[in-house]
Amino acid sequence: VAQLFHADAKKVAEARDQALKRWAKNPAVDHLIGRCLSRAYRFAESALHQRKALEFDAQYLPAKVQLCHDLLRLGEEEEAWKLAGAIREDDGYNIQAHNLGLLEKEMDGYVTKSFPDFILKMPKRDWPIYGERALQLLREAKALLAPKYGIDLKRPVLVEFFGEQSDFAIRTFGALGGQGMLGVCFGTVVTMNSPGSLANGRNNWESTLWHEFCHVITLSVTQNRMPRWLSEGISVYEERQRDSAWGMPMDATFREMTLNEEKLTPFSQLSGAFMKAKSQEEILFAYYESSQAVEYLLDTYGKHKFQGILRDLAAGKRVNDAITANCENVDEIEKRFSSFMTNKAKAFGAKADWNKPKPEDLNPFDESSFSEFLKKHPTSLWALQRHAEDAIKNKNWPELLQTGQKLVELVPEDFSGTSGYSLQVQALRQMKREEDEIVMLRRIAANASGAQSTFLRLIELDWPKKRWSEVLTHARRVTALNPFLLTAQKALAEAHAALNQPTESIHAWERVLVLDQSSAAQTHFRLAQLWKPTNAAKARRHLLDSLSLAPRNREGLEMLRHF
């Protein structure tokens, strides 16, 4: 096992022969080798070793189960389902095989859309809502990233969306668990939670899909031989290249962790950043730091040298050796990268005082103590945040607005829910200053991909004013979080129609028809109006459907008279 991750195939073969010396047909040897390879995402090699184990003992159950999982991760689903069925016949109590049987039945009801470049599988209800958008985004990613990283994908990429987290877990991990995971890539197979699942509205499924497809590219380039930090770092970096609001920008938490020597992982040890993480916060920081390392390498040494690192990884080199061979000594890079990270952290809110008060700075029994502290420390973020809380409690909106403005001056890069921008929005809304509120909301919307409440508020404010381009932009941002949200789909439909984009408006109304049967009469009527100039038969069909649900609709009856 120790020899597996070296490039010397001869040593690996010698170690295997030594393990088989006492028992030449011991299936456990190849099963163990394959299992370790599978953990390193080298599924094709793992499958070969599981087949060797089964040649030694055709009934060796651990090899059958592992081969089943490897086949699923290679996209060979038909063979995997058959093998899982055979395992159930041999061992009716095998939990993994039982769960795979349940998953197979569930996925039999999925819709499968096959194209030369992609195969998409998802619950039937999902395809009309976001299927075309997923395909469009995948093709955009492939057109951009494949030539950038110098690869031509020879086979279609399989992308599967799961409506239930438990189904996603069984398909992805072989067992229940993995809560919080949005998507996983195995090479040319991607599994994702549906944007209509429990995570809807909290995570940007479009950025997640872009992230996972980037893994398809980099894992293919390196033949699945790359450390997690580099793979994740490239994916997060490419998210930021696609949309500056994606890809984990610097925030107050990352700033604090970067400036903490115990939290910041040295460049040469990034391979351990994910393994040593003890909390969700530390895992997220590992993603962030990895993406910054990738950004540093690309900006400092250029695309061609970076591609050389990936080629060397595919040949079996260790990551630090590959970086040294293509760039310079890792120890030198480590020193400069540390300075790069520190300078970036210090630049975030550089004018602000990030220190919290000491116990002796405040007297909890003296109400004037806090006011005096704020006067002495006018740039203290802690004091300004508390002052904002007091203003909200007292409904002192002008004071809240002023405090928000001060926070924006101190930390203009912060667009979080507690930022100065958010405080100003709250104050302006209460003061009924809509146009000023819109200006502030748009600044947040342009920089925060997960700000669903902000996007919805902008739709609410721009729609009555018939600012259709803005309505369209914000509705698209909402559907990147939750395409099943009716408000956003109706906004898309109305905005496209107003902008003289009938085809797009028709598609949006068709999604509304799926999502909201209670207003089907009105939706069919709108579709009839949109189809009439180009397809009278479809228009008439929708009109009749509308009138069957609302026979007293005078506009509909008048329209029918003119057919």
What kind of feature is each model-predicted range?
Residues V1, E14, Q18, V29, ...:
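Beta/coil-rich, acidic/histidine-enriched accessory regions frequently appended to metallopeptidases
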Residues F5, R39, R73, E106-M107, ...:
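Register position in tetratricopeptide repeats
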Residues K10, R73, E78-W81, M226, ...:
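Amphipathic alpha-helical substructures
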Residues W23, D57, D91, H377, ...:
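A structural motif in tetratricopeptide-repeat
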Residues V1-L103, R526-Q529:
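Alpha-helical protein-protein interaction scaffolds
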Residues A2, E14, K21, G109-R228, ...:
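Juxtacatalytic substrate-recognition/specificity segment
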Residues L32, Q66, L100, R386, ...:
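Canonical tetratricopeptide repeat
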